[in-house]
């Protein structure tokens, strides 16, 4: 008898938007990052409003929002030093979508 999986596979129905907003500090060329459940990632948002709220929450001056493509966000995350290993879509900060880049 063959058994089939009756629940969805985790992560297969989650997608990242084609365009994202990140927080960038132009003077130092650093980006806003986030740590969730032991995973470090580049913080990204589907709206500029979400990015602004995160900037207010982390209370770092000089941060600017930057609209970039998903592929550009992946490259930025890959270029960040360890421990950054992912993109984190923080539209729901308590349950971020994580896309590993390394």
Language model region names:
Residues 1-102:
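Conserved NAD+-utilizing ADP-ribose enzyme module
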